[in-house]
Amino acid sequence: MQTGQALRLNKFLAERIGISRRQADDLIAGGKIQVNGKTAQLGARIDNTCKVCYNNKTIPFETSYIYLAMNKPVGYVCSRRQQGDSPTIYSILPKQYQTLKTVGRLDKDSSGIILLTNDGDFAFQMTHPKFVKEKIYEVTLDRALEPLHQQMIADFGIDLPDGKSKLGLEKLDEARKSWRVYMSEGRNRQIRRTFAAVGYQVEKLHRVQFGKYQLNNLPAGKFTEIEK
């Protein structure tokens, strides 16, 4: 950041301590953030000449950006908090990566590549629809996909409550149960809901690529640092 260049305090907190902007606003509203020795106010803007403190500790402005790719195992959730008996992917990560935020998500029953970073601009560019980042999945259905349903999904799209869903499909086996699925959107459980709308259950959903980042041979439950 250039000297004197202003940014919103909640964005700064979200990027530096690994929380959402809403959580950052809660900290500010609760009087837990100080700027230059004074209690910060909602909507405040700061620059790198300011001293920002939380829990009596100064939060540095300059940070080294980290980018991770993880092969998320089935059964793990992408949130920071454990949900019921389901462990979180953060239980896999060592302490130095605990403040990283996920770039998009995979549901508990899905596996494959998930990205994590402390670079908010990178996360935005990877997830905002205007940047069109293709994601590739390997999907196994409970039965053979009928050619008519293949055409409906790939050529015309399926009407879902949150809009039309159109997926690229590539057959992976002669039984027509295994498919490579291409999509650039990221709606919640979109692939599962699309197939369910025409009568199929997704038995396996595994993401192998997110934008230019590929899973390659990374084992389940392992992670590696990547370059932006």
Locate each region found by the language model.
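Basic, flexible Lys/Arg- and Gly-enriched helix-loop patches that mediate nucleic-acid binding at interfaces
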Residues: 2-228
